A protein has these predicted regions:
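Adenine nucleotide-associated cytosolic modules
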Residues: 1-111
Length: 111
């Protein structure tokens, strides 16, 4: 996979790390991750994975955004209250990095 100049500029601080380099950044671009739950940990995890360039991220959650979520689920805004987390998260994340493929699953996970 060839890294474009704009991608190089965006991810340069990761690429210059000896443990990552160009080869490592290419692996990040082609990585697949699944996040189960968009709560207090899932939201920042999604943001950081997106910002680092992970290429494909699945997100699973069944809940809607509630007003009580906003203090710890920093991905969401008051205007998102009442909407399903997975669909709002996809819209927000696509604004951060349009090259990331977000796959929302509105599913309830049970044991």
């Amino acid at each position: 996979m060839k890294i474009s100049l704009s991608q190089f500029k965006r991810f340069e601080k990761q690429i210059i790390l000896k443990k990552i380099g160009l080869a490592g950044q290419r692996r990040i671009f082609s990585a697949n991750v699944l996040i189960v739950g968009l709560g207090g940990l899932g939201c920042p995890l999604l943001t950081y994975l997106t910002s680092s360039g992970v290429g494909r991220i699945g997100i699973i959650d069944y809940d809607k955004v509630e007003i009580s979520n906003l203090n710890r689920q920093t991905l969401f805004y008051p205007k998102d209250v009442g909407k399903f987390k997975v669909y709002q998260a996809k819209k927000i994340i696509n604004k951060i990095n349009k090259k990331i493929k977000i796959i929302p699953f509105k599913k309830k996970i049970t044991s």
